[in-house]
Swiss-Prot record:
Function recorded in the entry: Component of the biogenesis of lysosome-related organelles complex-1 (BLOC-1) involved in endosomal cargo sorting.
The family this protein is said to belong to: Belongs to the VAB2 family.
Self-association state and partner proteins as the record states: Component of the biogenesis of lysosome-related organelles complex-1 (BLOC-1) composed of at least BLI1, BLS1, CNL1, KXD1, SNN1 and VAB2.
Name of the protein in question: Biogenesis of lysosome-related organelles complex 1 subunit VAB2
CC terms in the record's Gene Ontology section: cytoplasmic vesicle; vacuole
Taxonomic superkingdom: Eukaryota
Coiled coil feature spans: 57-133
Gene of this entry: VAB2
Source organism (scientific name): Vanderwaltozyma polyspora (strain ATCC 22028 / DSM 70294 / BCRC 21397 / CBS 2163 / NBRC 10782 / NRRL Y-8283 / UCD 57-17) (Kluyveromyces polysporus)
Main localization (coarse): cytoplasm
UniProt subcellular location: Cytoplasmic vesicle; Vacuole; Cytoplasm
């Protein structure tokens, strides 16, 4: 008896499935060279276009770099030409200066140094001149009296002459110490006082009061008067402003009727002060604010010769007392208490 064989189909096998996935074999015509080139021709064309584009860009950049290099080279050539030209000029100038043996720049520096030396010598000369002038000023000021000195530490002097006192305080500080010592010695020398008290009775049609005068005279040596002061309380006689101006250098000239009728019983001093103020001497006047003053005795005719006075000061101080008949101050208010301080240096006659 025969055995039956069982045949197994591969259609459902794994190998058959994998084989069926493979593409079918192309024909032999497609595997030829021409067919292959025809298939890749588009891609080859794209590659060619890309290569041409890259080449054009690179070529353009290279040309730009070349043009810039050419421009830089041209500028460098010009600069080199200028450098060579300048170098040639410098060498030529150096040769000329070396041959002449003189450097103009050094000559200019030497001239400048000479000018500076001249200015320094001029400044030194000016300083010496200023110091000589100050020495002369200090010498002249030292010969004056202490109350007439200008080179002192008073603030008003330094305000008028700030530069002068700055130099004095810097280089001549010892002068202020010497001036202070001299003023103390001068005050001690003038300590002698002579007190003369005199009483004057003045009769008037309107007033019957008496006037007391205290006359203090301070004589010193060398025939000079240093201080003359009058303090009094005159009787109350009104004098008009018009008539008060009519006082001359010889005494009372024209006043009102009450004043013209008065009698001076005692031979006391009658002092006038006329305005505007005048200098006692037109040549040797130190203080500007002093006025012409004559002190006379009516009967004895003893007078101070003001024409011989060299310098002096008169100060009048108003108060709240009216003027009297025995003492007239023109151009002042009628409500005053006359106080006169007179300073002379040299007076020919000082007998009272």
């Amino acid at each position: 008896m025969r055995n039956k064989l069982n045949f197994q189909n591969i259609e459902h096998s794994y190998a058959f499935k994998e084989l069926s996935k493979l593409p079918s074999i192309v024909s032999s015509k497609q595997l030829r060279t021409n067919s292959i080139f025809e298939a890749v021709k588009p891609e080859l064309k794209n590659v060619q276009n890309d290569i041409q584009m890259f080449y054009s860009v690179i070529e353009r950049e290279i040309n730009s770099e070349i043009s810039q290099i050419d421009l830089v080279e041209t500028e460098l050539k010009k600069s080199l030409k200028n450098v060579n030209k300048s170098y040639a000029k410098i060498m030529k100038r150096r040769t000329i200066l070396s041959s002449n043996g003189k450097n103009k720049n050094l000559a200019i520096v030497d001239d400048f140094n000479k000018e500076v030396d001249g200015l320094e010598s001029l400044i030194t000369g000016l300083k010496e001149t200023v110091h000589d002038m100050i020495d002369d000023l200090v010498t002249a000021d030292s010969q004056l009296k202490s109350n007439n000195k200008s080179v002192t530490k008073e603030e008003i002097n330094s305000q008028h002459y700030p530069l002068l006192f700055e130099i004095l305080q810097k280089d001549y500080n010892h002068i202020f110490k010497e001036s202070n010592n001299l003023s103390v010695q001068d005050a001690d020398r003038k300590s002698i006082e002579l007190d003369i008290e005199d009483r004057t009775e003045v009769k008037s049609s309107d007033d019957k009061d008496s006037m007391n005068k205290n006359i203090n005279i301070m004589p010193i040596e060398d025939n000079s008067i240093t201080h003359l002061s009058f303090e009094g309380e005159p009787i109350y006689t009104k004098v008009s402003h018009e008539n008060s101006n009519q006082v001359t250098d010889k005494g009372i000239n024209q006043l009102d009727e009450n004043t013209l009728n008065q009698e001076i019983k005692n031979d006391n001093l009658i002092c006038q002060r006329s305005l505007p103020p005048k200098n006692l001497s037109n040549e040797n006047v130190v203080n500007d604010n002093y006025a012409d003053s004559n002190c006379l005795k009516e009967e004895k005719k003893n007078e101070v010769d003001t024409s011989k006075s060299k310098m002096g000061t008169i100060n009048s101080t108003p108060s709240s007392t009216t003027m009297g008949n025995g003492f007239i101050l023109p151009n002042l208010t009628k409500v005053v208490k006359p106080t006169i301080s007179t300073t002379f240096e040299t007076v020919v006659n000082r007998e009272f």
